C-alpha cells in the first residue's frame, strides 16, 4: 500500500514543484507566509520538524527565518525536489525520505 502512495506522490512531484516555484517567485505570497510563520513561531530560533514537506516551501521560509529545519516526506520525488530547492534557494535544511 505504501509503495502505491509513494509512487503517486512521486509522479505528482513535478506539478507540486511547479506550484512551489510560482509561490516562491511571488513576493506577496512569500511575504504573507513569512509574516504568518513569524507570528506562529516567535523570535527565538527553533528546531522544526516538517512532516510531509513536499518540495519544501514552508521549510525554505522557516530556514530563512533562522530556524533549524528537518524536512521529511514519504515520496522520493518530493524529497528530490526539496533537496534541489534548498540548494537553489541557498538554505540548509536536513531532508530525508521516511514513511
List each language-model region with its residue ranges.
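Conserved class I S-adenosyl-L-methionine
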Residues: 1-43
Amino acid at each position: 500500500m505504501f509503495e502505491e502512495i509513494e509512487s503517486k506522490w512521486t509522479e505528482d512531484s513535478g506539478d507540486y514543484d511547479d506550484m512551489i516555484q510560482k509561490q516562491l517567485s511571488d513576493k506577496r505570497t512569500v511575504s504573507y507566509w513569512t509574516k504568518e510563520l513569524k507570528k506562529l513561531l516567535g523570535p527565538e530560533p527553533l528546531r522544526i520538524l516538517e512532516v510531509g514537506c513536499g518540495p519544501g516551501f514552508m521549510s525554505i521560509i522557516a530556514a530563512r527565518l533562522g530556524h533549524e529545519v528537518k524536512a521529511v516526506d514519504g515520496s522520493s520525488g518530493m524529497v528530490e525536489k526539496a533537496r534541489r530547492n534548498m540548494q537553489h534557494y541557498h538554505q540548509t535544511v536536513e531532508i530525508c525520505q521516511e514513511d
